[in-house]
């Protein structure tokens, strides 16, 4: 059995020596000399610092292991070494949660009625469908619905603008043709 050095334990029964008290060296009196107890405490602290000056025993072998442990701790970062593919172009910036969809409110820009009427009259699809109807061909329900909606909108716009759709008689057409100067179109 190894020998153990006896130490003096300070208990409530024993009186406290001044040497056993911890003295803060920083609290030393400014401008005055240190007492012998303070000098002893300071010397003991300095001796402890000098005693543990060197490296720990076996540090030559354990230093390599510590470096390896440090490297392993650094690699634990999940962002480093990830095999997950990262898209270069962000497709969806804000993904709403399931069931929480904000309905998009369509703001219809109100056009000038004259411009809208002009667009409807120059609509190629509408003109082709009207030509097909005039030729006696049958068109699908969706096409017929489109034609009806466009014609209704045209009549609304004409009423709003105060334009009356007059069916010109053949005599009126003949008179306008006679009055025209053909040289204007050359």
Swiss-Prot record:
Compositional bias (Basic and acidic residues) at which positions? Answer: 62-77
**GO terms of biological process kind:** ribosome biogenesis
A Pfam cross-reference name = YihI
Q: Which residues lie within the region annotated Disordered?
A: 42-77
Q: Which UniProt keywords apply?
A: GTPase activation, Ribosome biogenesis
Subunit annotation: Interacts with Der.
What is this protein for, i.e. what is its function?
A: A GTPase-activating protein (GAP) that modifies Der/EngA GTPase function. May play a role in ribosome biogenesis.
Q: Which family does it belong to?
A: Belongs to the YihI family.
Q: What is this protein called?
A: Der GTPase-activating protein YihI
**Organism (species):** Haemophilus influenzae (strain ATCC 51907 / DSM 11121 / KW20 / Rd)
Which lineage? Bacteria, Pseudomonadati, Pseudomonadota, Gammaproteobacteria, Pasteurellales
């Amino acid at each position: 059995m190894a020998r153990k050095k006896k130490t003096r334990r300070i208990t409530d029964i024993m009186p406290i020596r001044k040497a056993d008290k911890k003295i803060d060296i920083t609290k030393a009196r400014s401008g005055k000399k240190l007492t012998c107890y303070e000098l002893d405490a300071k010397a003991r602290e300095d001796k402890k610092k000098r005693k543990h000056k060197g490296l720990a025993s076996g540090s030559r072998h354990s230093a390599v292991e510590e470096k390896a442990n440090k490297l392993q701790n650094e690699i634990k970062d999940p962002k480093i070494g990830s095999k997950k593919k990262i898209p270069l172009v962000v497709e969806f910036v804000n993904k709403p949660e399931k069931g929480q969809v904000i309905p998009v409110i369509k703001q219809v820009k109100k056009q000038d009625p004259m411009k809208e009427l002009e667009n409807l009259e120059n609509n190629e699809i509408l003109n082709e469908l009207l030509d097909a109807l005039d030729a006696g061909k049958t068109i699908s329900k969706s096409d017929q619905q489109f034609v009806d909606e466009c014609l209704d909108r045209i009549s609304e716009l004409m009423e709003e603008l105060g334009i009356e759709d007059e069916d010109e008689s053949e005599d009126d057409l003949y008179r306008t043709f006679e009055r025209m100067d053909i040289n204007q179109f050359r």
